[in-house]
């Protein structure tokens, strides 16, 4: 929101925020992208970014890149290991979007909407038993003491989306835009 209204020129965000604005980005479903190399090929060898950006034009956003954040997405659980889909049926998973609900409905698993700031407490109180994320997230947010297991589902790459204000970007003088674009490419190579 801050990028859209011009308070920030560049920001990182989760995929859910942009998926609501771009049907193509929303169509990236779990298990479609099998590795980081696969996502690299999609971003570097296709018009995927250009097509997503065409869908974001009315929202004054440009999707610059995906910043990879760790291992592939899996399932973090409290109290119960998960070895098969049937093991999930007794659990309540933390969700954030309608897409999450659709996935859990297909698995016949219950979901509970919980704000990220409340996940640790929701795990401690039994409001939720699990969430989907890469394993590093439990460490980054101090959930290690309330989670017991990680199941490597390899649902897809874990990434934050790097966006910029379209107005700001298009107003950059050509020499500054060239430097900015080179920085984005350099960041992609380093990531």
Task: List each model region and its residues.
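Acidic, metal/ion-coordinating pockets
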Residues: 45
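N-terminal secretory/targeting leader peptides
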Residues: 1-38, 54-191
């Amino acid at each position: 929101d801050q990028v859209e209204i011009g308070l920030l020129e560049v920001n990182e965000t989760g995929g859910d925020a942009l998926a609501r604005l771009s049907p193509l980005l929303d169509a990236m479903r779990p298990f479609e992208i099998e590795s980081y190399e696969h996502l690299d090929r999609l971003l570097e060898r296709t018009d995927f970014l250009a097509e997503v950006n065409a869908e974001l034009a009315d929202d004054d956003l440009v999707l610059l890149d995906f910043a990879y954040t760790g291992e592939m997405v899996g399932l973090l659980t409290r109290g119960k290991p998960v070895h098969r889909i049937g093991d999930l049926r007794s659990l309540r998973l933390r969700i954030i979007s309608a897409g999450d609900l659709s996935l859990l409905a297909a698995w016949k698993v219950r979901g509970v909407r919980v704000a990220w700031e409340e996940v640790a407490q929701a795990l401690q109180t039994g409001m939720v038993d699990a969430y989907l994320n890469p394993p590093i997230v439990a460490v980054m947010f101090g959930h290690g003491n309330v989670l017991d297991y990680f199941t490597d589902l390899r649902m897809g790459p874990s990434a934050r989306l790097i966006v910029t204000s379209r107005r700001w970007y298009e107003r950059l003088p050509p020499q500054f835009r060239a430097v900015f674009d080179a920085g984005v490419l350099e960041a992609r190579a380093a990531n």
